[in-house]
Curated annotation (Swiss-Prot):
InterPro entries, per the entry: FAD-bd, FAD/NAD-bd_sf, FAD_mOase_fung
Cofactor: FAD
Segment forming the signal sequence: none
Pathway in which the depicted protein is active: Secondary metabolite biosynthesis; terpenoid biosynthesis
Family under the similarity heading: Belongs to the paxM FAD-dependent monooxygenase family.
Protein name in UniProt: FAD-dependent monooxygenase ntnA
EC number: 1.-.-.-
Binding site for FAD: 34, 48, 109, 311, 324
GO molecular function, one term: FAD binding
Gene: ntnA
Catalytic site: 218
Amino acid sequence: MAIPFKVLIIGGGVAGLTLAIMLEAYGFDYELLEKHSDVAPKLGAGVGLTPNGARILDQIGVWEMMCERSSPVDSGTALSPEGRTVIFNPNMGEWLQKLFGYKIHFLSRHDCLKILFNKIQQKSRVHLLKEVIKIEAGNLGEKGYVETKDGSIYTGDIIIGADGVRSSVRRELWRIADSESPGYIPKQDKTGIVSFYTAVVGIAYNSGLPEGGSARAYNHHRSYFFQEGREGSGEFYWWLCAKNEKTKEGVIPKLSSEVKEGLLNKYKNDQIGPDLTLGALYKSSIYSTVIPLQEFVLQKCFYKNILLIGDTFRKLHPVAGQGANSAIEESAFVADMLWDLRERGALHDPDSIQKALTEFQTERVVRTTALREDANLVQRMESLDNPVMKFMALKFIPRLNFVIAFLPQLGSSFTPARHLKHLRPPKVGLCPFSQDMKAKPLPRSPLATFSWVTVLILAASSPWLASKYFISGARSFTDDQASQLAEVLELYISILSVSISGMWVIESYKTSSLISPFTSSLPWILASNFWGWQKILPIYICFYILSSQSVVYYYMPQTMTDLGVAKALLPALLVVYTVSAVCTINESGGNTDNSWWFTADFAFPVVAYLSGMFLNATSTMPQAVDVVFSTIDIPYQRRFQNTIAFVGFVAYAALASQYGTTILNEGLNLLNIPAVKNLASLTTVTTLWCLYSAWELRRINATGTSVIRAWLTILSSTIFGGPAATLAGTFIWSKVELAKATSFHPTMQSTDTL
């Protein structure tokens, strides 16, 4: 007979109620304690439900009811401080549904909580007016005890704290941990609760704001957000987020009405629409309040059998709309965790529970830290925090393509999310979520990043160090022979530069490169031809390694955003470099002159871009989301890189057949020749880059090839096929592997679903 197991949930908000529904669906015993007299008071701001939360709500059977009481976000608008439209996209809702299966919906917090509460089958397990005052934690696998203000005692095998920012459970967890295990709770967890902004939130009727979408208004050190409530109701929710004069630390008590009135009077003349000011909006409001916007992510969210979720564990700035959705994700994680422990008969096994809770903590800290950083960046930009943010918000970003600049960033906040593994799978769109992918991106450790960058710098400088300290200076061939070898090697370096510039061009068309040092390949090519490829390539790769260490990086589309350019890669390559080769031969009279190759390096990205524009304008091909969020460009990349690899191999074979014996005999003494030194540096750097790429793919589980096998293949290819062919081959291999690993993959779905 199975040993009884009870979950004790503290808090009847979004996190607590969704967890209760999931536990009922999974057949777990539970009780829920809520300190207020009503789980769905008619107070508070609205709730935005994004695809990552919507798909879980769909699984537990409440999504349709949520939609009936909500308004879909069909469009997106951003306004300048003068009330002028700087961004408008009427297709946002349609695109989100196509990509992720669900639109964003917005409804009142009251309706959201009421729908969740009504879904609970055994309402006798929900106890109101039960304010927690003391907890006695049990060891893992044992029971814990909770005492409420009215003297009641409740027990549970695991205690889930979901009682919000001002959490009694968190306070008790810290008290117990500090008493029993001093130092377990990091100092940062207690001092890292901060507030940079204060918000006034309100509900207005028939305010004159546009229906059917969300709107944001930018202003100096403040911003606004507006959203229709239930569709057709005339109800609008609005937020004023104002930057505090000083950063506030610690859990902040409720703010007074004087603070609210002060902010409203200070900004009453702000233009938040063509014919609407904040003062006029406030006059049409039936409800308003002021709240401190606190932000934190705890590094420790459990101790013994107490686990924190929702706003008890982390608090995000509401500008990104991920607070409630993250709570839903965490509830799903906990429910699946308990199901899996039960399936293994490990609900009372301390080691198994410890491992499961540690996995929860690790994954959720990474996920919510990324969400917090993204939300903070968005708020700083919308409140024009400094001249750079002001320029980005009002001048630069409005000129960017919405599909390329906004949707991938928005999607990267959705797709790392989980869903319930043991209920009917949710609807899907073009974009897979984390459980649908083979790849399992994790943030790269700072130590690993530092190590790769350090080794890369040492590798790039190794030929210079070797030439200075390890060569004798004597060689057995004449200066004329050395000059001929140098000319041939310069020609091979030119071919290697084609492989490098081809990689740079492709990377410049990725969504993650849009606002980065990689947004254009031309500056890198210009610098390489001026200062040398052997000096610029290591800098590029160091920047690349540093910029790709976040987990969000791999949830962005990894392929090219312009199908026309992808199709034009190979034709542009053949035309530009064939012309360059012919001109070089005709003008040199048999001597190698690389000036035409330099011209070709500049011309290639320009010709590819112009050819792509022509193809997009004159032929029918997929556009917008059907390109950016697909792998349709991969075959064109493959042909392009295979051509470079073939030419690079032929050139290397010709070089090896003519000078291979000389190079082997002379060894390091050849480093006296600058061309040899440059090629040696480029070879070590490109080889190390290929080794890093293989290691990184394996680290995120994007390839089944072992690191040792991949490295041996890369080293063998470099020796026998040359660095140009190896770089091109490794680059396209990594692109194909990553594209497959971040596309839909057969989900490890339990056959025992409900």
